């Protein structure tokens, strides 16, 4: 699948996207780990969540409001308690953390505002698979865990676009998922992790090298 067009951005800006094949595989921990390991990039961090029907995009709670009223929302995190994912981003060192909530299938409606937020950023790191339909990052990493059977369609769709794989060290020889081939990333770097460590020195250096090679000095 062809990559989405890149948003208008500063020539000295980098966009990193962290995806994964299911919930609870460590995407948020990888984002927070990279922010902490690479503070010199002054990250703006975005977490993108798509909800099912009957859940309000304004606050993530169940509701019966008109779909067109609350199809998406973006809020900026201010709390540093560490209780939410975006709060963890701030604690890790992000200069700004944003939570994007949309109804399933309606992410496109939030994209113009997302692009504006990206344009305001020095560098950006996003937690999402589906954003790849609309944004072309400088680097895309996917987090995989053989012990988790679920494999999102969005993760399958963009697997071949991953620049590298962050793979939980196998607890079993056979992956929990079925009907999924990792051939699209067979030639890509694979970094094994052992939680609670989600970002190794090798991962941080790989990201630094890739991001630095794409950055151009400011005019």
What feature does the model see in each segment?
Residues 1-10, 217-218:
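Intrinsic disorder/low-complexity segments
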Residues 17-34:
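Glycine-rich phosphate-binding P-loop
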């Amino acid at each position: 699948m062809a990559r989405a067009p890149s948003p208008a951005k500063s020539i000295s800006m980098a966009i990193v996207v962290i995806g994964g094949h299911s919930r609870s595989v460590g995407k948020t921990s990888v984002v927070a780990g990279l922010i902490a390991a690479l503070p010199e990039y002054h990250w703006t961090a975005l977490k993108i969540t798509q909800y099912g029907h009957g859940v309000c995009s304004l606050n993530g709670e169940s509701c019966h409001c008109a779909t067109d009223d609350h199809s998406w929302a973006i809020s900026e995190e201010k709390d540093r308690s560490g209780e939410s994912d975006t709060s963890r981003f701030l604690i890790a060192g992000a200069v700004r953390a944003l939570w994007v909530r949309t109804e399933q299938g309606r992410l496109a409606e939030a994209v113009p505002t997302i692009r504006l937020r990206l344009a305001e950023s020095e560098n950006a790191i996003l937690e999402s698979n589906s954003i790849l339909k609309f944004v072309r990052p400088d680097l895309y990493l996917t987090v995989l865990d053989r012990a988790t059977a679920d494999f999102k369609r969005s993760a399958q769709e963009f697997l071949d676009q991953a620049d590298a794989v962050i793979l939980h060290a196998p607890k079993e020889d056979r992956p929990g998922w079925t009907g999924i081939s990792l051939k699209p990333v067979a030639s890509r770097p694979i970094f094994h992790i052992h939680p609670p460590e989600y970002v190794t020195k090798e991962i941080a250096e790989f990201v630094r090298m890739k991001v630095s090679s794409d950055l151009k000095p400011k005019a």
